[in-house]
Structure formats: structure tokens, C-alpha cells
From Swiss-Prot:
<dbReference type="Pfam" id="PF13238">
    <property type="entry name" value="AAA_18"/>
</dbReference>
<dbReference type="GO" id="GO:0006015">
    <property type="term" value="P:5-phosphoribose 1-diphosphate biosynthetic process"/>
</dbReference>
<keyword id="KW-0067">ATP-binding</keyword>
<keyword id="KW-0808">Transferase</keyword>
<dbReference type="GO" id="GO:0033863">
    <property type="term" value="F:ribose 1,5-bisphosphate phosphokinase activity"/>
</dbReference>
<comment type="similarity">
    <text>Belongs to the ribose 1,5-bisphosphokinase family.</text>
</comment>
<keyword id="KW-0547">Nucleotide-binding</keyword>
<comment type="function">
    <text>Catalyzes the phosphorylation of ribose 1,5-bisphosphate to 5-phospho-D-ribosyl alpha-1-diphosphate (PRPP).</text>
</comment>
<dbReference type="GO" id="GO:0005829">
    <property type="term" value="C:cytosol"/>
</dbReference>
<dbReference type="GO" id="GO:0005524">
    <property type="term" value="F:ATP binding"/>
</dbReference>
<comment type="pathway">
    <text>Metabolic intermediate biosynthesis; 5-phospho-alpha-D-ribose 1-diphosphate biosynthesis; 5-phospho-alpha-D-ribose 1-diphosphate from D-ribose 5-phosphate (route II): step 3/3.</text>
</comment>
<dbReference type="InterPro" id="IPR012699">
    <property type="entry name" value="PhnN"/>
</dbReference>
<dbReference type="InterPro" id="IPR008145">
    <property type="entry name" value="GK/Ca_channel_bsu"/>
</dbReference>
<dbReference type="InterPro" id="IPR027417">
    <property type="entry name" value="P-loop_NTPase"/>
</dbReference>
<protein>
    <recommendedName>
        <fullName>Ribose 1,5-bisphosphate phosphokinase PhnN</fullName>
        <ecNumber>2.7.4.23</ecNumber>
    </recommendedName>
</protein>
<dbReference type="GO" id="GO:0019634">
    <property type="term" value="P:organic phosphonate metabolic process"/>
</dbReference>
Length: 183
């Protein structure tokens, strides 16, 4: 059986990076991979294990075909390295921090992907965005508005609520992976 792409998505501040970090050790121990995405954000940005590059470098990587998936959101460009294709061919499950707005394009490239939507109560989301201090109030409001516009109603995806316990959410994600519940 081949590997699966587990496409984790959710609003900025929903806890995707925290969740990926919480499951990292067990996913790697089971032979899976968690992808470090490329983002046009300063490498000093708090809270995300990503490779920060300049917009010019991102465009160069894109032109070189370095990305299996790429998109733009919230004024930034994001890329998933092409290396994921090798891991999937090798039979490894691969977790990525994806984008709700790019899900349809990701499904076209990876029809068997497992879409996982991380949800969080709106008041919790606002509090998390304010606490991390990475965006201005205007940017936070724009992110909250984008979250309200991208509900993914009717989409075939697993939903995990991360409003409370990260440990419980991590266990739920690991159960999905183990049971191949997305298949």
C-alpha cells in the first residue's frame, strides 16, 4: 500500500503547527514524514517550523519546479517541497500544513489525499492570534474574516476541534492516521 498525503488545514491560529509538533515524534517513529514548508516570511517569525525565504527566492524556486504544491494567502507565498512525491512513492504517510483555499488544487494533484480540517471556536482563535503577536490588529481581522469565508461545508474532510486540549487533538489525529480513516 502506498503512502498517503495528510493535508492538515485550518485558520491561522487554529494550532496546526502546534499539532504537527505534538505528533511529530510518533509519526516519524512510524516511518511517516512531516513537511517543512517554504514561506515568504522572516525566518525569525514565531510559531512555525518553516523555511523563510524572500519573495524573490520563492519565485526562483517556483520557476525551478521545486514545489509539489504552492499557493498565496494572507499576503504570503507558501510552497510544499517536491520531495513529498518521493516519500509517497516510498509508501510513507506525509503530513503537510496546507491551505483551505488550495484544497481543490491539492486534490487534483493528489486525489487520494486525506483532508483534515482543524477547527477552533472564534473567540479562542482571536485570543491565540493576539497572543502570538505576529500580526497587526488589521491583519488579525483580515485572517478572521478569511476564516469566516472558508467554512468548507460539504467538503469531504475529517474535522478535529482544537479549541481545548492539544493532547486530545493530537491523539485524534494519530487515530485517523493509524486507522487510515481518511481512505
Amino acid at each position: 500500500m502506498g503512502g498517503r498525503l495528510i493535508y492538515l488545514m485550518g485558520a491561522s491560529g487554529s494550532g496546526k503547527d502546534s499539532l504537527l509538533e505534538a505528533v511529530r515524534e510518533r509519526v516519524l517513529a512510524a516511518g511517516g514524514r512531516i513537511v517543512r514548508r517554504v514561506v515568504t516570511r522572516s525566518p525569525e517569525a514565531v510559531g512555525e517550523d518553516a523555511l523563510g525565504v524572500s519573495p524573490e527566492r520563492f519565485e526562483q524556486l517556483l520557476a525551478e519546479g521545486a514545489f509539489a504544491l504552492h499557493w498565496r494567502a494572507n499576503g504570503l507565498a507558501y510552497g510544499i517541497p517536491r520531495q513529498i512525491d518521493d516519500w509517497l512513492v516510498d509508501g510513507r504517510d506525509v503530513l503537510i500544513n496546507g491551505s483551505r483555499g488550495h484544497l481543490a488544487a491539492a486534490r487534483r494533484r493528489y486525489p487520494e489525499l486525506c483532508a483534515v480540517l482543524l477547527t477552533v471556536e472564534p473567540q479562542v482563535l482571536r485570543q491565540r492570534l493576539l497572543a502570538r503577536g505576529r500580526e497587526t490588529i488589521e491583519e488579525i481581522e483580515a485572517r478572521l474574516a478569511r476564516n469566516a469565508r472558508l467554512p468548507l461545508d460539504g467538503e469531504d474532510c475529517q474535522r478535529l476541534d482544537n479549541s481545548a486540549s492539544l493532547a486530545q487533538t493530537a491523539e485524534a489525529l494519530l487515530r485517523l492516521i493509524r486507522k487510515r480513516a481518511c481512505a
